[in-house]
Amino acid sequence: MKSVSKAVLILASLLFICAGTAGDSKTGDHALILGGGGPVGEAWESGVIAGLTEKGIDLSRADLIIGTSAGAIVGARLASRMPPSDLINAALAPSDGSPPGQPDQRSSSPPPDLSFLAAKLQEMDTGKGSQQSIRAEIGEWAQRVRPVVSESQFVASYHRRFPEKEWPGRAYECISVDAADGSLRVWSGSSGVPLPVAVASSCALPGVFAPVTINSHRYIDGGVRSVTNADLARGCKIALVLAPTMGPNDALAKSFTRPLNGELRTLGDSGCKVELIVPDDASLKAFGATLGDETHRAPAVNAGRVEGRNMAGEIAKLWSD
């Protein structure tokens, strides 16, 4: 690993409380699962979706859309039936919610020390010990350290991204982790939480963004549990998974492969047909060195768009079942 901070950016680069568990089964035919991957992953997923749409495959018609971290942003837009052109324009905007062309407010901030987070994520990858307990350790650390972006600034940026504050009419869920005990939280329209706040909680990368407070609980990035949380779609007949972190040649990214493979097996064992889309060689080249690099949004969108068009024939067979 060239640097711990660079590697962990991949993760960013990943009511009453509506609590979901991996044992819950979903109903419906088609599930779209959008994984985390920072601003570059957000752009790539948006491009893939636009490319598929241009070939006649409308993923917004999914019976269930599950988004984690960057995928939560894309999923909320798609579930709201945002046109492909608007989806791409939104993906090109800086992460702080400023209009395209304006500098990201974090650009002058020093890189955070994420060595603790990296160590804990790699500990989780070994499969030893309680996964939830390790997530709780990460949550405790996230509440203790000084983030690059404060909670108020972070949540405000999501209110700018989603000014309507209303949940989409279609079934859409986003994933976060309770910082106190490491438990999974699945947010939906029935959770009684404003959409921007729920999505922000799914994107609150520990050490970079402050945990997000909802109903006296604090929440961190859903990617701490899984970069896709694909197992939560168990019970659906068909699942399409977009996973931008599965391609980058980085030690931490490779560590995500084992848990994702387990999630895909869980779906398959439940009788679900699964298709996984990961970045192709052209997309990987467009990504640059890290999924956290805002300057690679446009190349990632363009590469994803081409990849989506190229994948359309294969995806059409799955999506039409």
Predicted segment positions?
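Bacterial N-terminal signal peptides that target proteins for export
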Residues: M1-L9
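Patatin-like phospholipase
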Residues: A19-I66, A76-D321
